[in-house]
Amino acid sequence: MCIRDRVYAQPLDLYVGQSLSAERFTEELRRLGYLSSETTDRPGTYRRKGGRVDVHLREFRFSDELQPAQSLRLDFSGGTMSSLRDSRGSDVPVARLDPLLIGSIFPTHGEDRIVVSPGEVPPLLPEALKAVEDRKFDQHLGVDPLAIMRALFANIRAGQVEQGGSTLTQQLVKSYFLDSRRTLRRKAEEAVMAIILEARFDKADIMNAYINEIYLGQDGRRAVHGFGLASQFYFGKPLSELDLHEVSLLVAIVRGPSYYDPRRHPERAIERRNLVLRLLAEQQVVSVEQAEAAASRPLGVTGSVRRGGSFFPAFLDLVRRQLRRDYREEDLTEAGLTVFTTLDPLLQEKAEAALTAELKRQDGSKREEAHGLEGVVVVTSPQTGEVTAMIGGRLASMDGFNRALDARRPIGSLAKPLVYLAALETGAFTPASIVQDEPVQLKLPNGQLWEPNNFDKRSNGPVTIVEALTRSLNLATGNLALEVGLDRVAQTFQDLGLEEAPPEYPSMLLGAVDLSPIEVAQIYTTLANGGFRSPLRAV
Protein backbone atom coordinates (compact mmCIF):
# COMPACT_ATOMS: atom_id res chain seq x y z
CA MET A 1 0.00 0.00 0.00
CA CYS A 2 1.16 3.54 -0.76
CA ILE A 3 1.11 5.17 2.68
CA ARG A 4 0.54 8.88 2.46
CA ASP A 5 2.62 11.08 4.72
CA ARG A 6 0.61 13.77 6.47
CA VAL A 7 2.15 17.22 6.15
CA TYR A 8 0.95 19.95 8.49
CA ALA A 9 1.45 23.69 8.77
CA GLN A 10 2.40 25.44 12.00
CA PRO A 11 -0.21 25.09 14.75
CA LEU A 12 -1.65 28.25 16.27
CA ASP A 13 -0.59 28.59 19.91
CA LEU A 14 -3.23 30.00 22.26
CA TYR A 15 -2.31 31.96 25.39
CA VAL A 16 -3.45 35.04 27.31
CA GLY A 17 -1.91 38.24 25.99
CA GLN A 18 -1.48 36.86 22.49
CA SER A 19 -1.98 39.34 19.65
CA LEU A 20 -5.10 37.70 18.26
CA SER A 21 -8.60 38.96 17.52
CA ALA A 22 -11.85 37.02 17.63
CA GLU A 23 -12.19 37.56 13.87
CA ARG A 24 -8.81 36.08 13.07
CA PHE A 25 -9.34 33.18 15.48
CA THR A 26 -12.67 32.21 13.91
CA GLU A 27 -11.03 32.56 10.50
CA GLU A 28 -8.45 29.99 11.59
CA LEU A 29 -11.21 27.71 12.85
CA ARG A 30 -13.05 27.87 9.53
CA ARG A 31 -9.81 27.16 7.69
CA LEU A 32 -9.46 23.99 9.76
CA GLY A 33 -13.01 22.87 9.00
CA TYR A 34 -14.53 23.71 12.38
CA LEU A 35 -18.28 24.24 12.17
CA SER A 36 -20.19 27.13 13.72
CA SER A 37 -22.84 25.64 16.01
CA GLU A 38 -25.21 26.65 18.77
CA THR A 39 -23.70 23.91 20.91
CA THR A 40 -20.05 22.88 21.17
CA ASP A 41 -20.51 19.41 22.60
CA ARG A 42 -18.62 17.78 19.71
CA PRO A 43 -14.97 18.19 18.69
CA GLY A 44 -14.62 20.44 15.66
CA THR A 45 -17.37 22.91 16.60
CA TYR A 46 -17.33 26.50 17.85
CA ARG A 47 -19.68 29.32 18.82
CA ARG A 48 -18.89 33.03 18.72
CA LYS A 49 -20.77 35.82 20.48
CA GLY A 50 -19.05 39.16 20.12
CA GLY A 51 -15.58 38.95 21.64
CA ARG A 52 -16.16 35.51 23.17
CA VAL A 53 -15.53 32.22 21.38
CA ASP A 54 -16.38 28.77 22.74
CA VAL A 55 -14.58 26.00 20.90
CA HIS A 56 -14.29 22.24 21.23
CA LEU A 57 -10.75 21.41 20.11
CA ARG A 58 -10.05 18.13 18.37
CA GLU A 59 -7.72 15.53 19.74
CA PHE A 60 -4.37 15.76 17.97
CA ARG A 61 -1.00 14.07 18.36
CA PHE A 62 1.73 16.68 18.08
CA SER A 63 5.41 15.79 17.84
CA ASP A 64 5.84 16.29 21.59
CA GLU A 65 2.48 15.29 23.08
CA LEU A 66 -1.02 13.98 22.54
CA GLN A 67 -3.42 16.85 23.11
CA PRO A 68 -6.85 15.48 24.04
CA ALA A 69 -10.09 16.95 22.77
CA GLN A 70 -11.12 19.76 25.09
CA SER A 71 -13.64 22.57 25.40
CA LEU A 72 -12.23 26.08 25.78
CA ARG A 73 -13.67 29.56 26.26
CA LEU A 74 -11.63 32.42 24.82
CA ASP A 75 -12.27 36.13 25.39
CA PHE A 76 -10.78 38.82 23.16
CA SER A 77 -10.42 42.54 23.71
CA GLY A 78 -8.51 45.19 21.79
CA GLY A 79 -6.96 42.70 19.39
CA THR A 80 -5.53 40.44 22.10
CA MET A 81 -6.67 37.34 23.95
CA SER A 82 -7.75 38.44 27.42
CA SER A 83 -8.68 35.06 28.93
CA LEU A 84 -8.39 31.35 28.20
CA ARG A 85 -10.39 28.92 30.31
CA ASP A 86 -11.49 25.29 30.18
CA SER A 87 -15.02 23.93 30.59
CA ARG A 88 -14.70 24.12 34.40
CA GLY A 89 -13.73 27.80 34.29
CA SER A 90 -10.09 27.15 35.22
CA ASP A 91 -7.36 29.19 33.56
CA VAL A 92 -5.42 27.36 30.84
CA PRO A 93 -1.76 28.45 30.45
CA VAL A 94 -1.43 27.42 26.80
CA ALA A 95 -3.27 25.34 24.21
CA ARG A 96 -2.78 24.60 20.53
CA LEU A 97 -5.15 24.39 17.61
CA ASP A 98 -4.75 21.28 15.51
CA PRO A 99 -2.62 22.33 12.52
CA LEU A 100 -3.82 22.66 8.95
CA LEU A 101 -3.22 19.60 6.76
CA ILE A 102 -1.48 21.18 3.76
CA GLY A 103 -0.65 18.24 1.52
CA SER A 104 1.15 14.97 1.07
CA ILE A 105 4.70 13.88 0.38
CA PHE A 106 5.81 11.13 -1.97
CA PRO A 107 2.49 9.49 -2.92
CA THR A 108 3.36 6.97 -5.63
CA HIS A 109 1.37 6.08 -8.75
CA GLY A 110 -0.56 9.36 -8.45
CA GLU A 111 -2.47 8.13 -5.39
CA ASP A 112 -3.22 9.99 -2.16
CA ARG A 113 -4.64 8.70 1.08
CA ILE A 114 -4.85 9.53 4.76
CA VAL A 115 -4.46 6.27 6.64
CA VAL A 116 -6.93 6.08 9.53
CA SER A 117 -6.91 3.66 12.43
CA PRO A 118 -10.06 1.81 13.56
CA GLY A 119 -10.39 4.30 16.42
CA GLU A 120 -10.65 7.17 13.93
CA VAL A 121 -13.49 5.53 12.00
CA PRO A 122 -17.08 6.38 13.00
CA PRO A 123 -18.84 3.10 13.94
CA LEU A 124 -21.54 3.87 11.40
CA LEU A 125 -19.16 3.58 8.42
CA PRO A 126 -18.35 -0.16 8.51
CA GLU A 127 -21.98 -0.95 9.29
CA ALA A 128 -23.11 1.15 6.32
CA LEU A 129 -20.59 -0.51 4.01
CA LYS A 130 -21.81 -3.93 5.03
CA ALA A 131 -25.47 -2.96 4.65
CA VAL A 132 -24.99 -1.52 1.17
CA GLU A 133 -22.05 -3.38 -0.32
CA ASP A 134 -21.73 -6.73 1.48
CA ARG A 135 -24.51 -7.87 3.83
CA LYS A 136 -22.82 -11.18 4.65
CA PHE A 137 -19.37 -9.73 5.23
CA ASP A 138 -19.19 -11.19 8.74
CA GLN A 139 -20.14 -14.70 7.53
CA HIS A 140 -18.62 -15.35 4.10
CA LEU A 141 -15.09 -16.56 3.38
CA GLY A 142 -14.25 -13.99 0.73
CA VAL A 143 -16.90 -14.59 -1.92
CA ASP A 144 -20.69 -14.79 -1.69
CA PRO A 145 -22.35 -16.60 -4.63
CA LEU A 146 -25.83 -15.93 -3.26
CA ALA A 147 -25.08 -12.20 -3.11
CA ILE A 148 -24.11 -12.24 -6.76
CA MET A 149 -27.45 -13.78 -7.74
CA ARG A 150 -29.42 -11.54 -5.37
CA ALA A 151 -27.75 -8.41 -6.73
CA LEU A 152 -28.46 -9.51 -10.30
CA PHE A 153 -32.20 -9.94 -9.68
CA ALA A 154 -32.46 -6.77 -7.54
CA ASN A 155 -30.83 -4.65 -10.19
CA ILE A 156 -33.04 -6.10 -12.94
CA ARG A 157 -36.14 -5.44 -10.86
CA ALA A 158 -35.09 -1.85 -10.03
CA GLY A 159 -33.98 -1.02 -13.54
CA GLN A 160 -30.73 0.38 -12.14
CA VAL A 161 -27.65 -0.79 -10.27
CA GLU A 162 -28.64 -0.79 -6.61
CA GLN A 163 -26.52 -3.66 -5.32
CA GLY A 164 -23.14 -5.14 -6.16
CA GLY A 165 -22.25 -8.79 -6.23
CA SER A 166 -18.61 -8.50 -5.19
CA THR A 167 -17.82 -8.73 -1.50
CA LEU A 168 -15.86 -6.01 0.24
CA THR A 169 -12.90 -8.39 0.24
CA GLN A 170 -13.15 -8.82 -3.53
CA GLN A 171 -13.38 -5.06 -3.99
CA LEU A 172 -10.26 -4.63 -1.84
CA VAL A 173 -8.38 -7.20 -3.90
CA LYS A 174 -9.46 -5.53 -7.13
CA SER A 175 -8.43 -2.08 -5.90
CA TYR A 176 -5.08 -3.06 -4.44
CA PHE A 177 -3.82 -6.04 -6.42
CA LEU A 178 -5.57 -6.18 -9.80
CA ASP A 179 -6.41 -3.98 -12.76
CA SER A 180 -9.90 -2.94 -13.86
CA ARG A 181 -10.26 -5.32 -16.83
CA ARG A 182 -13.64 -7.07 -16.94
CA THR A 183 -12.64 -10.58 -17.92
CA LEU A 184 -13.54 -13.98 -16.54
CA ARG A 185 -9.87 -14.65 -15.80
CA ARG A 186 -9.56 -11.52 -13.70
CA LYS A 187 -12.81 -12.28 -11.83
CA ALA A 188 -11.51 -15.76 -11.07
CA GLU A 189 -8.20 -14.36 -9.80
CA GLU A 190 -10.14 -11.87 -7.70
CA ALA A 191 -12.21 -14.62 -6.09
CA VAL A 192 -9.19 -16.82 -5.32
CA MET A 193 -7.20 -13.94 -3.86
CA ALA A 194 -10.19 -12.85 -1.75
CA ILE A 195 -10.42 -16.33 -0.24
CA ILE A 196 -6.67 -16.31 0.52
CA LEU A 197 -6.96 -12.86 2.10
CA GLU A 198 -9.82 -14.01 4.33
CA ALA A 199 -7.77 -17.01 5.44
CA ARG A 200 -4.81 -14.87 6.49
CA PHE A 201 -6.46 -11.83 8.06
CA ASP A 202 -9.39 -11.27 10.37
CA LYS A 203 -12.47 -9.32 9.37
CA ALA A 204 -11.51 -6.17 11.30
CA ASP A 205 -8.17 -5.92 9.46
CA ILE A 206 -9.85 -6.42 6.09
CA MET A 207 -12.48 -3.79 6.84
CA ASN A 208 -9.85 -1.28 7.95
CA ALA A 209 -7.75 -1.98 4.85
CA TYR A 210 -10.83 -1.45 2.67
CA ILE A 211 -11.62 1.85 4.39
CA ASN A 212 -8.07 3.05 3.71
CA GLU A 213 -7.71 1.71 0.16
CA ILE A 214 -10.91 2.05 -1.86
CA TYR A 215 -10.94 4.65 -4.66
CA LEU A 216 -13.31 7.54 -3.97
CA GLY A 217 -12.55 10.31 -6.43
CA GLN A 218 -10.04 12.37 -8.36
CA ASP A 219 -8.25 15.54 -7.28
CA GLY A 220 -6.60 16.77 -10.46
CA ARG A 221 -3.85 14.27 -11.20
CA ARG A 222 -4.14 12.58 -7.81
CA ALA A 223 -6.44 9.67 -7.13
CA VAL A 224 -8.27 10.01 -3.82
CA HIS A 225 -8.07 6.68 -1.99
CA GLY A 226 -9.60 5.85 1.36
CA PHE A 227 -12.34 7.40 3.45
CA GLY A 228 -9.86 9.42 5.53
CA LEU A 229 -8.74 11.54 2.60
CA ALA A 230 -12.20 11.52 0.99
CA SER A 231 -13.63 13.10 4.14
CA GLN A 232 -11.15 15.97 3.85
CA PHE A 233 -11.55 16.17 0.07
CA TYR A 234 -15.34 16.41 0.07
CA PHE A 235 -16.17 17.90 3.48
CA GLY A 236 -12.96 19.55 4.71
CA LYS A 237 -12.98 17.78 8.08
CA PRO A 238 -11.77 14.53 9.69
CA LEU A 239 -13.61 11.28 9.11
CA SER A 240 -14.44 10.96 12.82
CA GLU A 241 -16.58 14.13 12.66
CA LEU A 242 -18.90 13.09 9.83
CA ASP A 243 -22.65 12.93 10.38
CA LEU A 244 -25.06 10.33 9.00
CA HIS A 245 -25.81 12.18 5.76
CA GLU A 246 -22.08 12.68 5.10
CA VAL A 247 -21.09 9.07 5.79
CA SER A 248 -23.95 7.97 3.54
CA LEU A 249 -22.68 10.14 0.70
CA LEU A 250 -19.19 8.63 0.88
CA VAL A 251 -20.68 5.13 0.89
CA ALA A 252 -22.79 6.15 -2.11
CA ILE A 253 -19.72 7.32 -4.01
CA VAL A 254 -18.09 3.88 -3.69
CA ARG A 255 -20.31 2.55 -6.49
CA GLY A 256 -19.03 5.12 -9.02
CA PRO A 257 -16.80 8.01 -7.90
CA SER A 258 -16.96 9.73 -11.29
CA TYR A 259 -20.63 9.04 -12.00
CA TYR A 260 -21.72 10.13 -8.51
CA ASP A 261 -19.22 12.98 -8.13
CA PRO A 262 -21.18 15.37 -5.85
CA ARG A 263 -19.50 18.45 -7.29
CA ARG A 264 -20.11 17.60 -10.94
CA HIS A 265 -23.33 15.59 -10.62
CA PRO A 266 -25.12 16.68 -7.42
CA GLU A 267 -28.51 15.31 -8.52
CA ARG A 268 -27.12 11.83 -9.07
CA ALA A 269 -25.16 12.00 -5.83
CA ILE A 270 -28.12 13.01 -3.69
CA GLU A 271 -30.33 10.33 -5.27
CA ARG A 272 -27.70 7.65 -4.59
CA ARG A 273 -27.11 8.96 -1.06
CA ASN A 274 -30.80 8.79 -0.25
CA LEU A 275 -30.90 5.24 -1.60
CA VAL A 276 -28.09 4.37 0.81
CA LEU A 277 -30.09 5.93 3.64
CA ARG A 278 -33.16 3.85 2.74
CA LEU A 279 -31.03 0.69 2.73
CA LEU A 280 -29.59 1.60 6.13
CA ALA A 281 -33.10 2.02 7.51
CA GLU A 282 -34.24 -1.27 5.97
CA GLN A 283 -31.26 -3.06 7.52
CA GLN A 284 -32.03 -1.33 10.84
CA VAL A 285 -28.59 0.27 10.96
CA VAL A 286 -30.39 3.57 11.61
CA SER A 287 -34.01 4.38 12.36
CA VAL A 288 -36.46 5.48 9.69
CA GLU A 289 -36.67 8.89 11.36
CA GLN A 290 -32.88 9.30 11.28
CA ALA A 291 -32.75 8.29 7.62
CA GLU A 292 -35.53 10.70 6.66
CA ALA A 293 -33.88 13.56 8.55
CA ALA A 294 -30.54 12.86 6.88
CA ALA A 295 -32.19 12.63 3.44
CA SER A 296 -33.53 16.16 3.89
CA ARG A 297 -30.02 17.55 4.39
CA PRO A 298 -28.01 19.08 1.52
CA LEU A 299 -24.94 17.23 0.26
CA GLY A 300 -22.72 19.50 2.33
CA VAL A 301 -19.60 19.18 0.18
CA THR A 302 -17.18 22.08 0.11
CA GLY A 303 -17.67 24.39 -2.83
CA SER A 304 -14.22 23.97 -4.33
CA VAL A 305 -10.99 22.10 -3.90
CA ARG A 306 -7.42 22.99 -4.65
CA ARG A 307 -6.22 20.96 -7.59
CA GLY A 308 -2.85 19.34 -7.97
CA GLY A 309 -2.66 17.37 -4.73
CA SER A 310 -1.49 20.11 -2.39
CA PHE A 311 -2.45 23.49 -0.98
CA PHE A 312 0.97 25.12 -1.30
CA PRO A 313 3.02 23.37 -3.99
CA ALA A 314 6.12 25.62 -3.87
CA PHE A 315 6.47 25.21 -0.11
CA LEU A 316 5.85 21.47 -0.32
CA ASP A 317 8.55 21.25 -2.99
CA LEU A 318 10.99 22.70 -0.46
CA VAL A 319 9.76 20.22 2.17
CA ARG A 320 10.31 17.30 -0.21
CA ARG A 321 13.84 18.39 -1.06
CA GLN A 322 14.82 18.83 2.57
CA LEU A 323 13.34 15.47 3.52
CA ARG A 324 15.20 13.77 0.68
CA ARG A 325 18.37 15.41 1.93
CA ASP A 326 17.88 14.22 5.52
CA TYR A 327 16.13 10.83 5.17
CA ARG A 328 16.42 7.65 3.15
CA GLU A 329 14.05 7.38 0.20
CA GLU A 330 12.54 4.12 1.47
CA ASP A 331 11.71 5.74 4.82
CA LEU A 332 9.89 8.54 3.05
CA THR A 333 7.87 6.29 0.73
CA GLU A 334 7.04 3.48 3.14
CA ALA A 335 7.03 4.78 6.71
CA GLY A 336 3.95 7.00 6.60
CA LEU A 337 5.56 9.94 8.38
CA THR A 338 3.76 12.80 10.07
CA VAL A 339 5.61 15.94 9.00
CA PHE A 340 5.26 19.19 10.93
CA THR A 341 6.38 22.19 8.89
CA THR A 342 7.10 25.86 9.48
CA LEU A 343 4.38 27.20 7.16
CA ASP A 344 2.15 29.95 8.57
CA PRO A 345 -1.11 29.63 6.56
CA LEU A 346 -2.32 33.14 7.36
CA LEU A 347 1.02 34.66 6.37
CA GLN A 348 1.02 32.53 3.22
CA GLU A 349 -2.39 33.85 2.20
CA LYS A 350 -1.31 37.43 2.85
CA ALA A 351 1.79 36.86 0.72
CA GLU A 352 -0.32 35.44 -2.10
CA ALA A 353 -2.66 38.43 -1.95
CA ALA A 354 0.26 40.88 -1.95
CA LEU A 355 1.96 39.21 -4.93
CA THR A 356 -1.30 39.05 -6.88
CA ALA A 357 -1.96 42.74 -6.24
CA GLU A 358 1.54 43.78 -7.29
CA LEU A 359 1.50 41.68 -10.47
CA LYS A 360 -1.92 43.10 -11.31
CA ARG A 361 -0.54 46.61 -10.84
CA GLN A 362 2.44 45.81 -13.05
CA ASP A 363 0.19 44.24 -15.70
CA GLY A 364 -1.85 47.44 -15.77
CA SER A 365 1.19 49.61 -16.39
CA LYS A 366 2.16 50.75 -19.86
CA ARG A 367 5.66 49.35 -19.60
CA GLU A 368 6.04 46.56 -22.15
CA GLU A 369 8.56 44.66 -20.03
CA ALA A 370 5.99 44.33 -17.21
CA HIS A 371 3.60 42.22 -19.28
CA GLY A 372 3.75 38.52 -18.44
CA LEU A 373 5.89 39.29 -15.40
CA GLU A 374 6.47 36.47 -12.92
CA GLY A 375 6.99 36.83 -9.20
CA VAL A 376 8.01 34.80 -6.16
CA VAL A 377 7.85 35.29 -2.41
CA VAL A 378 10.06 33.78 0.29
CA VAL A 379 9.30 34.78 3.90
CA THR A 380 11.65 33.69 6.68
CA SER A 381 12.11 34.09 10.42
CA PRO A 382 15.69 35.40 10.89
CA GLN A 383 16.15 34.07 14.42
CA THR A 384 15.14 30.49 13.62
CA GLY A 385 15.68 30.15 9.88
CA GLU A 386 12.10 28.96 9.47
CA VAL A 387 10.52 29.49 6.06
CA THR A 388 7.04 30.68 6.96
CA ALA A 389 5.65 31.35 3.46
CA MET A 390 6.69 30.62 -0.12
CA ILE A 391 5.22 31.26 -3.55
CA GLY A 392 6.93 29.80 -6.60
CA GLY A 393 5.30 31.81 -9.37
CA ARG A 394 2.41 33.94 -10.55
CA LEU A 395 -0.10 31.11 -9.99
CA ALA A 396 0.59 30.23 -6.37
CA SER A 397 -1.56 27.09 -6.26
CA MET A 398 -0.20 25.46 -9.42
CA ASP A 399 2.49 22.80 -9.52
CA GLY A 400 5.31 23.35 -11.96
CA PHE A 401 8.62 25.17 -12.18
CA ASN A 402 9.42 26.47 -8.71
CA ARG A 403 11.03 29.84 -9.32
CA ALA A 404 11.61 30.39 -5.62
CA LEU A 405 14.08 27.50 -5.60
CA ASP A 406 15.27 27.11 -9.18
CA ALA A 407 15.09 30.45 -11.02
CA ARG A 408 18.63 31.83 -10.91
CA ARG A 409 18.94 35.47 -11.89
CA PRO A 410 21.59 38.22 -11.45
CA ILE A 411 20.94 39.74 -8.03
CA GLY A 412 22.01 43.27 -8.97
CA SER A 413 22.33 45.77 -6.14
CA LEU A 414 21.41 43.10 -3.58
CA ALA A 415 25.13 42.24 -3.70
CA LYS A 416 26.30 45.68 -2.55
CA PRO A 417 25.63 45.32 1.21
CA LEU A 418 27.98 42.34 1.17
CA VAL A 419 30.78 44.50 -0.22
CA TYR A 420 30.33 46.99 2.60
CA LEU A 421 30.08 44.23 5.20
CA ALA A 422 33.35 42.76 3.95
CA ALA A 423 34.97 46.18 4.30
CA LEU A 424 33.66 46.77 7.82
CA GLU A 425 34.80 43.33 8.96
CA THR A 426 38.42 44.16 8.09
CA GLY A 427 38.44 46.71 10.90
CA ALA A 428 39.99 49.29 8.60
CA PHE A 429 36.68 50.95 7.79
CA THR A 430 33.76 52.42 9.72
CA PRO A 431 30.38 53.65 8.45
CA ALA A 432 31.85 57.16 8.47
CA SER A 433 34.93 56.24 6.43
CA ILE A 434 35.39 58.09 3.15
CA VAL A 435 35.34 56.23 -0.17
CA GLN A 436 35.82 57.71 -3.62
CA ASP A 437 32.84 57.70 -5.97
CA GLU A 438 35.05 58.19 -8.99
CA PRO A 439 35.50 56.31 -12.29
CA VAL A 440 37.32 53.01 -11.92
CA GLN A 441 39.01 50.81 -14.50
CA LEU A 442 40.25 47.26 -14.16
CA LYS A 443 41.90 45.25 -16.90
CA LEU A 444 40.47 41.74 -17.15
CA PRO A 445 42.47 38.61 -18.08
CA ASN A 446 40.95 38.68 -21.59
CA GLY A 447 42.29 42.18 -22.14
CA GLN A 448 38.97 43.97 -21.82
CA LEU A 449 38.39 46.81 -19.36
CA TRP A 450 35.84 46.68 -16.57
CA GLU A 451 34.43 50.20 -16.35
CA PRO A 452 31.24 50.47 -14.24
CA ASN A 453 29.16 53.63 -14.02
CA ASN A 454 26.52 55.07 -11.74
CA PHE A 455 22.88 54.92 -12.72
CA ASP A 456 22.81 58.66 -13.45
CA LYS A 457 26.18 58.53 -15.27
CA ARG A 458 27.65 60.97 -12.72
CA SER A 459 30.39 60.67 -10.12
CA ASN A 460 30.08 62.22 -6.66
CA GLY A 461 33.64 62.39 -5.41
CA PRO A 462 34.37 61.55 -1.78
CA VAL A 463 31.36 60.12 0.12
CA THR A 464 30.94 58.23 3.37
CA ILE A 465 30.36 54.50 3.33
CA VAL A 466 26.86 55.08 4.73
CA GLU A 467 26.01 57.48 1.89
CA ALA A 468 27.50 55.19 -0.74
CA LEU A 469 25.40 52.27 0.49
CA THR A 470 22.15 54.18 0.93
CA ARG A 471 22.48 55.77 -2.53
CA SER A 472 23.63 52.47 -4.08
CA LEU A 473 26.59 54.13 -5.81
CA ASN A 474 28.28 51.77 -8.25
CA LEU A 475 31.58 53.67 -8.51
CA ALA A 476 32.04 53.95 -4.76
CA THR A 477 31.19 50.27 -4.33
CA GLY A 478 33.68 49.23 -7.01
CA ASN A 479 36.51 51.33 -5.59
CA LEU A 480 35.89 50.05 -2.07
CA ALA A 481 35.72 46.41 -3.19
CA LEU A 482 38.99 46.62 -5.08
CA GLU A 483 40.63 48.03 -1.97
CA VAL A 484 39.17 45.28 0.23
CA GLY A 485 39.85 42.49 -2.27
CA LEU A 486 37.62 40.35 -4.49
CA ASP A 487 38.50 37.23 -2.51
CA ARG A 488 37.28 38.74 0.76
CA VAL A 489 33.99 39.84 -0.82
CA ALA A 490 33.46 36.39 -2.36
CA GLN A 491 34.13 34.77 1.01
CA THR A 492 31.51 37.03 2.61
CA PHE A 493 28.90 35.57 0.25
CA GLN A 494 29.77 32.10 1.52
CA ASP A 495 29.96 33.17 5.17
CA LEU A 496 26.39 34.47 4.95
CA GLY A 497 25.00 31.18 3.69
CA LEU A 498 25.87 30.62 0.05
CA GLU A 499 27.08 27.04 -0.41
CA GLU A 500 29.93 28.07 -2.70
CA ALA A 501 31.67 31.42 -3.05
CA PRO A 502 30.93 33.11 -6.39
CA PRO A 503 33.67 33.47 -9.04
CA GLU A 504 35.98 36.37 -8.25
CA TYR A 505 35.06 38.59 -11.18
CA PRO A 506 34.77 42.36 -10.71
CA SER A 507 31.21 42.29 -12.05
CA MET A 508 30.30 40.21 -8.97
CA LEU A 509 30.66 43.37 -6.91
CA LEU A 510 27.67 45.01 -8.61
CA GLY A 511 25.44 41.94 -8.70
CA ALA A 512 26.48 39.86 -11.71
CA VAL A 513 25.94 36.76 -9.57
CA ASP A 514 23.16 34.36 -10.51
CA LEU A 515 21.28 33.23 -7.40
CA SER A 516 17.83 31.85 -6.66
CA PRO A 517 15.38 33.68 -4.37
CA ILE A 518 15.89 31.07 -1.64
CA GLU A 519 19.66 31.67 -1.76
CA VAL A 520 19.18 35.44 -1.49
CA ALA A 521 16.77 34.84 1.40
CA GLN A 522 19.43 32.76 3.18
CA ILE A 523 22.01 35.55 2.82
CA TYR A 524 19.71 38.27 4.07
CA THR A 525 18.29 36.10 6.86
CA THR A 526 21.83 35.82 8.22
CA LEU A 527 22.29 39.58 7.91
CA ALA A 528 19.00 40.22 9.72
CA ASN A 529 20.08 37.84 12.49
CA GLY A 530 23.18 39.88 13.31
CA GLY A 531 25.49 37.65 11.30
CA PHE A 532 24.45 34.40 12.98
CA ARG A 533 23.59 31.88 10.31
CA SER A 534 20.46 29.75 10.74
CA PRO A 535 20.09 27.41 7.73
CA LEU A 536 16.68 27.89 6.16
CA ARG A 537 14.34 25.04 6.94
CA ALA A 538 10.77 24.08 6.21
CA VAL A 539 10.47 21.11 8.60
What do the PLM-derived regions correspond to, one by one?
Residues M1-G364, E386-V387, E438, K443, ...:
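Juxtamembrane regions of bacterial inner-membrane/periplasmic proteins
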Residues L421:
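Extracellular glycan-interaction surfaces
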